[in-house]
Amino acid sequence: MGRIIAVANQKGGVGKSTTAINLSACLAEKGKKVLAIDMDPQGNTTSGFGVDKNGIENTLYELLLGEAETKDTIVKDVVENLDLIPSNINLSGAEIELVGIDDKEFILKGITDKLRRKYDYIILDCPPSLNMLTINALTAATSVLVPIQCEYYALEGLSQLIHTIDLVKERLNKRLKMEGVVFTMYDARTNLSLQVAVSYTHLTL
């Protein structure tokens, strides 16, 4: 059964999509079968893999709402060994449309649990907020990888995210583990970068 890694941080501009793209591509290059799922309405991971996010018929939005089959949503071999479930701005409406659905936190889990048999890794690029899409990702994931910038406010956001992860683990997904943090835009010449890195060494990969 494949591992499902959610790349998450509710703060924008910390390198989530870049981390998700590079992690997916590196695993694929090592011969692992990888599925990247773009859960951000901005669609940066989709664009990053060279897919026209405005020119695709079926995306994660249609899949979550039951308007498309999984097989019709997956873009095959965007890179060798790497498939993609794309996203675009339509996904921003999913939050409202999922409100009245029972067990809405488990919709993505129902999809990814079936896909785990086909892939070694499923990488979830989460949106920059702790909304229902991120809760779906954390409920589906086996672990969480958190990209953070080495700045003061990033630490504040990490505390909030860890609290959310703990709540999801307690109530929705007991298997969820903290994979670690990845320091992005790290500059070893600055004291702040060094202080942040030392403070969170116990969480890093």
Task: Give names to the regions the model predicted.
Residues 1-203:
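P-loop NTP-binding core
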